Amino acid sequence: TSKTKKEAALYLLKSYYYKAEFALQDEEEKKQIFNKGKSLGEEYINKHPDSAEFRYWYLVNLGSWAQVYGILTAAREGVSDLMKIHSEKIIELDPEYRNGGGYFMLGAVHYKSPYIPFLLSWPNNDEAIKYLQLSVETGKAEINQKNYLAQAVNKDGQHEKARKLLNEVINTKPNLNN
Protein backbone atom coordinates (compact mmCIF):
# COMPACT_ATOMS: atom_id res chain seq x y z
CA THR A 1 0.00 0.00 0.00
CA SER A 2 1.05 3.61 -0.37
CA LYS A 3 0.93 4.07 3.42
CA THR A 4 3.41 1.21 3.85
CA LYS A 5 5.70 2.67 1.16
CA LYS A 6 5.55 6.06 2.84
CA GLU A 7 6.43 4.56 6.25
CA ALA A 8 9.27 2.52 4.73
CA ALA A 9 10.68 5.58 2.95
CA LEU A 10 10.59 7.61 6.16
CA TYR A 11 12.31 4.80 8.07
CA LEU A 12 14.96 4.56 5.33
CA LEU A 13 15.50 8.33 5.42
CA LYS A 14 16.09 8.17 9.18
CA SER A 15 18.33 5.12 8.75
CA TYR A 16 20.54 6.90 6.22
CA TYR A 17 21.11 9.68 8.73
CA TYR A 18 21.84 7.40 11.68
CA LYS A 19 24.13 5.13 9.65
CA ALA A 20 26.23 7.95 8.20
CA GLU A 21 26.27 10.05 11.36
CA PHE A 22 26.97 7.34 13.93
CA ALA A 23 28.11 4.10 12.26
CA LEU A 24 30.56 5.25 9.59
CA GLN A 25 34.01 6.78 9.98
CA ASP A 26 35.07 7.11 6.34
CA GLU A 27 34.19 10.53 4.86
CA GLU A 28 33.54 9.15 1.37
CA GLU A 29 31.14 6.53 2.69
CA LYS A 30 29.36 9.21 4.73
CA LYS A 31 29.04 11.35 1.59
CA GLN A 32 27.48 8.44 -0.33
CA ILE A 33 24.92 7.74 2.39
CA PHE A 34 24.02 11.41 2.93
CA ASN A 35 23.63 11.77 -0.85
CA LYS A 36 21.12 8.92 -0.74
CA GLY A 37 19.30 10.58 2.15
CA LYS A 38 19.27 13.92 0.35
CA SER A 39 17.90 12.36 -2.86
CA LEU A 40 15.28 10.25 -1.08
CA GLY A 41 14.15 13.26 0.95
CA GLU A 42 13.75 15.37 -2.20
CA GLU A 43 11.79 12.58 -3.90
CA TYR A 44 9.37 12.14 -1.01
CA ILE A 45 8.90 15.87 -0.39
CA ASN A 46 7.79 16.06 -4.03
CA LYS A 47 5.41 13.13 -3.47
CA HIS A 48 4.18 14.39 -0.06
CA PRO A 49 4.61 18.18 0.00
CA ASP A 50 2.46 18.53 3.12
CA SER A 51 4.55 16.11 5.20
CA ALA A 52 6.41 17.83 8.03
CA GLU A 53 8.19 14.58 8.83
CA PHE A 54 9.68 14.09 5.36
CA ARG A 55 10.83 17.71 5.31
CA TYR A 56 12.35 17.39 8.78
CA TRP A 57 14.29 14.21 8.08
CA TYR A 58 15.37 15.59 4.70
CA LEU A 59 16.83 18.58 6.56
CA VAL A 60 18.55 16.33 9.09
CA ASN A 61 20.27 14.53 6.20
CA LEU A 62 20.92 17.77 4.30
CA GLY A 63 22.53 19.45 7.31
CA SER A 64 24.85 16.51 7.83
CA TRP A 65 25.50 16.39 4.08
CA ALA A 66 26.62 20.03 4.30
CA GLN A 67 28.98 19.23 7.16
CA VAL A 68 30.76 16.41 5.33
CA TYR A 69 30.97 18.29 2.02
CA GLY A 70 32.06 21.56 3.61
CA ILE A 71 30.83 25.10 3.78
CA LEU A 72 31.78 26.17 0.24
CA THR A 73 30.09 23.22 -1.46
CA ALA A 74 27.04 23.72 0.75
CA ALA A 75 26.94 27.43 -0.16
CA ARG A 76 27.23 26.66 -3.89
CA GLU A 77 24.39 24.13 -3.58
CA GLY A 78 22.19 26.64 -1.75
CA VAL A 79 21.86 24.41 1.31
CA SER A 80 21.20 27.26 3.76
CA ASP A 81 18.39 28.63 1.62
CA LEU A 82 16.87 25.14 1.25
CA MET A 83 17.07 24.61 5.00
CA LYS A 84 15.43 27.97 5.67
CA ILE A 85 12.59 27.34 3.19
CA HIS A 86 11.86 23.81 4.42
CA SER A 87 12.11 24.82 8.10
CA GLU A 88 9.55 27.57 7.54
CA LYS A 89 7.30 25.06 5.77
CA ILE A 90 7.60 22.59 8.68
CA ILE A 91 6.54 25.37 11.07
CA GLU A 92 3.60 26.19 8.79
CA LEU A 93 2.53 22.52 8.52
CA ASP A 94 3.10 21.39 12.11
CA PRO A 95 4.91 23.68 14.57
CA GLU A 96 4.75 20.93 17.22
CA TYR A 97 6.51 18.27 15.10
CA ARG A 98 9.56 16.85 16.94
CA ASN A 99 9.00 19.28 19.83
CA GLY A 100 9.38 22.38 17.68
CA GLY A 101 11.69 20.73 15.16
CA GLY A 102 10.93 23.32 12.49
CA TYR A 103 11.87 26.14 14.86
CA PHE A 104 15.01 24.21 15.83
CA MET A 105 16.08 23.73 12.21
CA LEU A 106 15.41 27.39 11.39
CA GLY A 107 17.35 28.54 14.45
CA ALA A 108 20.20 26.15 13.70
CA VAL A 109 20.51 27.30 10.09
CA HIS A 110 20.62 30.95 11.23
CA TYR A 111 23.30 30.02 13.78
CA LYS A 112 25.48 27.78 11.59
CA SER A 113 25.23 29.49 8.20
CA PRO A 114 27.91 32.04 7.44
CA TYR A 115 27.01 35.57 6.44
CA ILE A 116 28.32 35.93 2.88
CA PRO A 117 27.63 39.36 1.34
CA PHE A 118 25.60 39.19 -1.89
CA LEU A 119 25.28 35.40 -1.59
CA LEU A 120 23.92 34.63 1.87
CA SER A 121 22.86 37.82 3.61
CA TRP A 122 20.04 36.61 5.90
CA PRO A 123 21.79 34.46 8.59
CA ASN A 124 21.52 36.31 11.87
CA ASN A 125 22.37 35.23 15.42
CA ASP A 126 19.45 37.22 16.90
CA GLU A 127 17.10 35.22 14.67
CA ALA A 128 18.92 32.04 15.70
CA ILE A 129 18.25 32.83 19.36
CA LYS A 130 14.60 33.67 18.64
CA TYR A 131 13.88 30.41 16.82
CA LEU A 132 16.00 28.22 19.09
CA GLN A 133 14.16 29.69 22.09
CA LEU A 134 10.85 28.87 20.38
CA SER A 135 12.04 25.31 19.81
CA VAL A 136 12.93 24.92 23.49
CA GLU A 137 9.50 26.28 24.48
CA THR A 138 7.55 24.03 22.05
CA GLY A 139 6.71 20.60 23.39
CA LYS A 140 9.41 18.96 25.49
CA ALA A 141 12.76 20.72 25.17
CA GLU A 142 15.36 18.41 23.67
CA ILE A 143 19.04 18.32 24.59
CA ASN A 144 20.14 19.33 21.09
CA GLN A 145 17.80 22.34 21.15
CA LYS A 146 19.22 23.57 24.46
CA ASN A 147 22.78 22.93 23.29
CA TYR A 148 22.32 25.04 20.14
CA LEU A 149 20.53 27.77 22.11
CA ALA A 150 23.42 27.82 24.58
CA GLN A 151 25.90 28.26 21.71
CA ALA A 152 23.85 31.07 20.15
CA VAL A 153 23.37 33.01 23.41
CA ASN A 154 27.06 32.53 24.25
CA LYS A 155 27.96 34.01 20.85
CA ASP A 156 25.68 36.93 21.81
CA GLY A 157 27.66 37.49 25.02
CA GLN A 158 25.01 35.99 27.32
CA HIS A 159 27.54 33.72 29.01
CA GLU A 160 25.57 33.11 32.23
CA LYS A 161 22.46 32.04 30.32
CA ALA A 162 24.62 29.76 28.16
CA ARG A 163 26.19 28.21 31.27
CA LYS A 164 22.74 27.65 32.81
CA LEU A 165 21.47 25.93 29.64
CA LEU A 166 24.55 23.73 29.40
CA ASN A 167 24.14 22.71 33.04
CA GLU A 168 20.56 21.69 32.21
CA VAL A 169 21.92 19.63 29.31
CA ILE A 170 24.52 17.95 31.53
CA ASN A 171 21.91 17.12 34.17
CA THR A 172 19.32 15.76 31.73
CA LYS A 173 18.45 12.12 32.28
CA PRO A 174 18.85 10.09 29.07
CA ASN A 175 15.65 9.40 27.15
CA LEU A 176 15.71 5.73 26.24
CA ASN A 177 12.75 6.18 23.85
CA ASN A 178 14.68 8.44 21.47
Report each predicted region and the residues it spans.
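Ligand-binding pocket scaffold of soluble enzyme catalytic domains
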Residues: 93-96, 100, 144-145, 149-152, ...
